[in-house]
């Protein structure tokens, strides 16, 4: 028996990367998936079927949350799983951030998660469903030049914990995943530079970036009955990056070579 057999699921930002991997994994395990994205070409590349449908939407647009939820109810007559994956990184430094830029990053990284979950709440209450928010390790720790993004993702983590407390008595579970550096089309440009790749290897105990399928595996667990007693949790899937102040011997040696007098 597949873990998600007949269970309707919404996955946002599902045209590529982490969202695509989650949508395909849930569908592989039996879910009826509505894959949502603003990228119509990316959605068209998904292997659509009667149980894997696509919906083009800008999650930050007025009325989009209600439209997304309405489409899932129309297609599949319910919502059992909601995966809020839409996000936007590469924000400007704090001192260069305009109000318009702040709103752009806050809207997609935080407001969309809030509003889509709010729109889906009645259906999730009926189904005793699951919400999974894709946050970031930058919502757990500080990092240079990521103030707006980190603030938004920290807010998603706070929302996750509060919703878990608020709706546990109605049978709804709410968890989050905090991915580290994952090899996706969005990160390919940076990962393909030797310096950035060396830095990731040098600060991650597992010595490599993660794969979207590894986030999807964690997502499938948290959304399934196997995690039936898990709520309000944030699972870092980051190769151990946030578990310690890990620095590889190679990076230590680089520092020594650069400061031979110390």
What do the PLM-derived regions correspond to, one by one?
Residues 136:
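Residue(s) in the substrate-gating loop at a strand-loop-helix junction
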Residues 176, 195-230, 237-239:
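C-terminal helical subdomain
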Residues 95, 141-148, 169-170, 207, ...:
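Active-site loop immediately N-terminal to the catalytic Tyr-X3-Lys motif
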Residues 141, 231-262:
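Short C-terminal tail/terminal secondary-structure segment
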Residues 117, 152, 160:
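Active-site helix of classical SDR
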Residues 122, 165-169, 228:
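Alpha-helical segment proximal to the catalytic Tyr-Lys
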């Amino acid at each position: 028996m597949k873990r998600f057999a007949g269970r309707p699921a919404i996955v946002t930002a599902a045209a590529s990367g982490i969202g695509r991997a989650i949508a395909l994994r849930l569908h592989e395990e039996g879910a009826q998936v509505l894959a949502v994205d603003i990228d119509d070409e990316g959605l068209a590349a998904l292997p659509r079927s009667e149980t894997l449908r696509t919906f083009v939407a800008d999650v930050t647009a007025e009325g989009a949350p209600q439209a997304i939820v309405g489409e899932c109810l129309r297609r599949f007559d319910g919502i059992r799983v909601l995966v809020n994956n839409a996000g936007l990184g590469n924000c400007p430094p704090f001192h260069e951030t305009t109000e318009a830029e702040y709103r752009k990053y806050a809207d997609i990284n935080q407001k969309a998660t809030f509003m889509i979950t709010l729109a889906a709440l009645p259906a999730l209450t009926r189904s005793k469903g699951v919400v999974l928010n894709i946050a970031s390790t930058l919502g757990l720790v500080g990092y240079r030049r990521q103030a707006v993004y980190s603030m938004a993702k920290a807010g998603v983590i706070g929302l996750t914990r509060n919703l878990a407390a608020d709706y546990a008595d109605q049978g709804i579970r709410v968890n989050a995943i905090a991915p580290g550096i994952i090899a996706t089309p969005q990160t390919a440009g940076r990962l393909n530079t030797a310096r950035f790749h060396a830095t990731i290897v040098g600060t991650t105990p597992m010595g490599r970036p993660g794969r979207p399928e590894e986030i999807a595996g964690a997502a499938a667990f948290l959304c399934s009955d196997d995690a039936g007693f898990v709520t309000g949790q944030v699972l870092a899937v980051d190769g151990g990056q946030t578990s310690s102040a890990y620095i590889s011997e190679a990076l230590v040696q680089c520092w020594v070579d650069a400061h031979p007098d110390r």
